[in-house]
Amino acid sequence: MKGHYIPITMRKAGAEGFLLFKYLKMNMKHIVCLCCVITVVLMSATAHPDSAELEVVDSVDLSRYLGKWYEIASYPAWFQRGRTASTAEYAMLTDGKIRIINRCHKGRTDGPLKESVGKAEVSDDQTNAKLKVWFFWPFKGNYWIIDLDDDYRWAVVGEPKRKYLWILSRTPTMNQTLYQNILSRLPSKGYDPSKLNPTLQKTTSGID
């Protein structure tokens, strides 16, 4: 009895299909492992504080927040390079926006005085803790109040990408105990306290 004739092309296709199946079977474990690794990485990124949405304080009374603030420490920022004795002063305007006057000295605490005037507006009416700030229209930046003293004696300001951070005080200096207490809460917000640079305020750093 003669066997059935199988064309060469079909035999070749069958062989290639078998080899492909064998290849996939051999590499299936690697594919599964890779998927597991990707899943773990994604879960880790989601769980990491600096990838989560930055939380702000529950409520800000803007009338109490207005006034003069001294910069105690901050993340390095290109627009503040070589600046000392930095202060910020906020005042409410008739249109509901907030006027900002930032002052600092260039090079040293008795160096040339620099002043920048800008505006801010609330972007979250529920908390008043998220504001948009601009000094050159139409470029706006985020100003999020992420920690605040009950008596409005100090504040911590950040932004959602966590690239910038400022610790502010109503006085030019802050005692070390309070400063360390504020720093201890920063990691849970996705910030690295070691990146902070103390700000010189006149003849001393902003930290006692």
Residue ranges of each PLM-predicted region?
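Short hydrophobic transmembrane-like helices used for membrane targeting/insertion
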Residues: M1, I6-M10, I31
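Positively charged N-terminal leader segments that act as targeting/secretion signals
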Residues: P7-L19
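Generic low-polarity alpha-helical segments
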Residues: K2, G17-F18, S44-T46
